[in-house]
Amino acid sequence: MGYLKRFALYISVMILMFAIAGCGKGNETKEGSKETQIKKSFAKTLDMYPIKNLEDLYDKEGYRDGEFEKGDKGMWTIYTDFAKSNKPGELDDEGMVLNLDRNTRTAKGHYFVTTFYRNGKLPDEKNYKIEMKNNKIILLDEVKDDKLKQKIENFKFFGQYANLKELKKYNNGDVSINENVPSYDVEFKMSNKDENVKQLRSRYNISTEKSPILKMHIDGDLKGSSVGYRKLEIDFSKRENSKLSVIEFLSYKPAKK
């Protein structure tokens, strides 16, 4: 199970590297259940979904605080990955991260293919540089594998087809809080009839019929800040020592450092 812990740490580091940010405009959270507050904290971002044309983000502003320099329009980062335990002792993780700079109206990132190992062996990782123009992913590195090349060029982020505006229908979640970080987690059982679940099943090799769990994680202030992150995961895993999930985040942070 060690490689699953390493994978979780790797994802957290990836998120901190590419999106140390709070998502969406800050919203005054009224006193109420933490479940409600967490959903409200996510709502401003998730209400933007689906973002069919990612270039629309050039004209959208997220939560701003004192970390932004005067005149900095900020940068959106969108990230989606699919992780699956295909072989005993191994975990395959594949996805894309894209940074959209609102100052220059340019979008650059990379597609990644990573394999984690339980025996302590260092992960195998390959990154392929990409950019986006006219809402189309353009591969900058040479890829000889035609299947992989097509997968990269036709890649769609979960946020481009997801519809999570009806968060209110998910209730009685399992909430956990660490006030020292602070961090907040809530989990909801999803139905296989959910359109988001159907979309994921049509796009990824999800072998189980098990209904997934929607996991919402926040590091940082619930009201929003440019320090911390928000992560959404739809987990299809059948067993504790296996992994089958899709992770998504959309964040807004200063573009100028």
UniProtKB/Swiss-Prot annotation:
Keywords: Cell membrane, Lipoprotein, Membrane, Palmitate, Signal. The keyword Cell membrane applies. A lipid is attached at residue 23 (S-diacylglycerol cysteine). A lipid is attached at residue 23 (N-palmitoyl cysteine). It is a lipid-anchor. It comes from the Bacteria. GO terms for cellular component: plasma membrane. Residues 1-22 form the signal peptide. It is found in: Cell membrane. InterPro entries: Csa, Csa_sf. PROSITE patterns: PROKAR_LIPOPROTEIN. Belongs to the staphylococcal tandem lipoprotein family. This is Uncharacterized lipoprotein SAR0439.
